[in-house]
């Protein structure tokens, strides 16, 4: 392990000890924001510091074993020292690799729940139908992960599917797996309404955003205009007779969110505020990305809605992810929620890129 890395790990270990001490401070316990920040930092440090402590112990065992081999005459003790030396050399090599991977930059949002928005884009009715197919695909994938999914807002398409659907997925490390789904999903297939059997290309866009808490995204009440109105149901069914639907406008950004599917006006306001925090976060991220150097563009994609990320070719039962060049000839299985192969490939590509960037920095 190089000296810079070792020094950084020593600093992390000291920082963790300081955080543990601070978390016992009464003033910090009263400050929810500070308490939350420290707990988050503690969680980020604990695992790597634990591995570093293991690494240092293994290094000490190597020193002890070498000392025995240099000074001991007893053959039995020498044999035991050789075994210990081999075991701890392997351990040090393994721990060094694990620690270096842990030290790669992490996405602070990876542990978060997500809000997903799917829109039917180019292709009219067929795009809306495909948006519905994507929603079903994500629902099925969520089931395999034991995640919970909840529709927040939906505009049903005239021929089926959705012109727009917004839903939340809650569970373990949802954003870390679904963040790469953001972008334009292109479908090539023969629409059911196409009498001549011609293949049509349509597009649905997906935006995957981390759920943001009130602590992370602070929105002032005087920056909001809140309107209430009567909720409308499909075909006039189950329409509320009270003004339970909520529309919130964020005046500084002009962002508008609505919710009408909650059980009460209070529920709808909570849902709308959750969506608003996420939308404000998205606007801030887009602003930062626009200001960033274009040459530093992420290899696995920008996450922009307009970026074509995947093509679903129904006649050939083929799906291609254009960011990693992965093609699977089992579209039928993918649409049943079997998207892990794409997710794993994209995570690996992100990891590979981070390692390359870190090596570049080390050589500077």
UniProtKB/Swiss-Prot annotation:
InterPro entries noted in UniProt:
PCRF (IPR005139), Pep_chain_release_fac_I (IPR000352), Pep_chain_release_fac_I_sf (IPR045853), Prokaryotic/Mito_RF (IPR050057), RF-1 (IPR004373)
- Tell me what PTMs the record reports for this protein: Methylated by PrmC. Methylation increases the termination efficiency of RF1.
Gene Ontology molecular-function annotations: translation release factor activity, codon specific
**Which Pfam family would be a valid example here?**
PCRF
**Source superkingdom:** Bacteria
Modified residue annotations for N5-methylglutamine: 237
| PROSITE patterns for this protein | RF_PROK_I
Question: What does UniProt give as GO cellular component?
Answer: cytoplasm
Compartment(s) where it occurs, according to its Swiss-Prot or TrEMBL record: Cytoplasm
Q: Note the SUPFAM superfamilies from the entry.
A: Release factor (SSF75620)
Swiss-Prot/TrEMBL keywords: Cytoplasm, Methylation, Protein biosynthesis
Function summary: Peptide chain release factor 1 directs the termination of translation in response to the peptide chain termination codons UAG and UAA.
Per the record, the similarity remark reads: Belongs to the prokaryotic/mitochondrial release factor family.
The record's listing under PANTHER family reads: LD18447P (PTHR43804:SF7)
Protein name, please? Peptide chain release factor 1
| Lineage start | Bacteria, Bacillati, Mycoplasmatota, Mollicutes, Mycoplasmataceae
